[in-house]
Amino acid sequence: MAQVRGGVGEMLGTLFERHHVALFNFFYKLTGQRAMSEDLVQDVFFRILKYRQSYRPGTGFRAWMYQIARNARVDLLRRQHPEISWEPEMSPAFVPEDQPQQDQQAFLLRTALLELPEEKREVLVLSRFQDLKYEQIAEILGCELSTVKVKVHRALHELRDIFQKLEAGKLLRKAGPQGPGIRPGSGSVQ
């Protein structure tokens, strides 16, 4: 980043190669929308170049980059109407039964993550999917380390509750309205 800050624009390509996948995953886990995530990644790297002089050498680049990412996302939300649709590209109402168990679990986890309130989803994505340290997250969010720990704990608890409800709903849909093992209309056990 020091070379980009010093005016060596070619080094931005190196930063892009190093960080664009992580940024895309960050945005995609927050929004569930592929095209929006790609646009936001481009916007972040444009801003890194534009605001390169604001980077303080010796501070964590990743924390600075994720702060820019948060700002880019907030700016996008402000530009759009207040009731932006954050519907994921895959419907959570249907979990394909022919998927392997691990794929179904991953689908339910993604769905549960998108069901979390935005603030809780963001802190989980930063800590669990982007592997940032709590100290870095505190810097990004502008809060105390202890606050980050509490937020992560509460977000994990709520994620677990949502996941369990989704999993229970999947089992109910699989069993049907009569319950497991009962054929509709026959009263006999299958």
Task: State the predicted function of each range.
Residues 75, 82-106, 177-187:
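Internal acidic/polar
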Residues 5-6, 32, 43-60, 79-81:
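Sigma70-family region 2
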Residues 1-22, 114, 176-190:
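N-terminal module of bacterial RNA polymerase sigma factors
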Residues 70, 74, 120, 141-168:
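DNA-recognition helix of helix-turn-helix
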Residues 3, 87, 108, 139-142, ...:
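C-terminal edge and immediately downstream basic/flexible tail or linker adjoining helix-turn-helix-like DNA-binding
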